[in-house]
Amino acid sequence: MMSKVFFDITIGSDTAGRIVMELFDEVTPKTAENFRALCTGEKGVGKAGKPLHFKGSHFHRVITDFMAQGGDFTRGNGTGGESIYGEKFADENFQLKHDRPGLLSMANAGPNTNGSQFFLTFVPCPWLDGKHVVFGEVVEGLEILEQLEANGSQSGQTKQAIVISDCGEIK
């Protein structure tokens, strides 16, 4: 059974809707568990003194024809974030490829620097294979992903604030 998690997304002052993702627990158990727990907030407060929880955090970088990046709940600008295992953890494996839209993959700052930042692909991104760990995919709400992309830009700056207003696990 794959874990299923959700994000309720707000764009500006409007409720955009829900994105449901399945996590590839069998291929990337450690990475999937980190993301699942950050969706529920069940691990409490991290070393940075902030809750280990995506709720209320932003998609700080959205590049059209590429991806939407979020998960920096400590600084909100792409320089922060924290995993449930401590600040950073190793790349689990590169078994899965960035071969389609709607994939969930870990953002990083180089090898073995996974924290809480992630991205959702808008297109196949083969140049990321072997550098970023794919650990899940969108199973409902691809149209919400399109709304995220419509609020992005080539620079990554968003036109309006894109917020994870709620998130959790679907049992």
Curated annotation (Swiss-Prot):
It is an enzyme of class 5 (isomerase). Residues 6-169 form the PPIase cyclophilin-type domain. This is Peptidyl-prolyl cis-trans isomerase slr1251. It comes from the Bacteria. The keyword Isomerase applies. Belongs to the cyclophilin-type PPIase family. The keyword ATP-binding does not apply. One of its GO terms (biological process) is protein folding. It catalyses: [protein]-peptidylproline (omega=180) = [protein]-peptidylproline (omega=0). Keywords: Isomerase, Rotamase. GO terms for molecular function: cyclosporin A binding; peptidyl-prolyl cis-trans isomerase activity. GO terms for cellular component: cytoplasm. Coiled coil: none annotated. Its EC number is 5.2.1.8. It holds the Pfam family Pro_isomerase. PPIases accelerate the folding of proteins. It catalyzes the cis-trans isomerization of proline imidic peptide bonds in oligopeptides. It comes from Synechocystis sp. (strain ATCC 27184 / PCC 6803 / Kazusa).
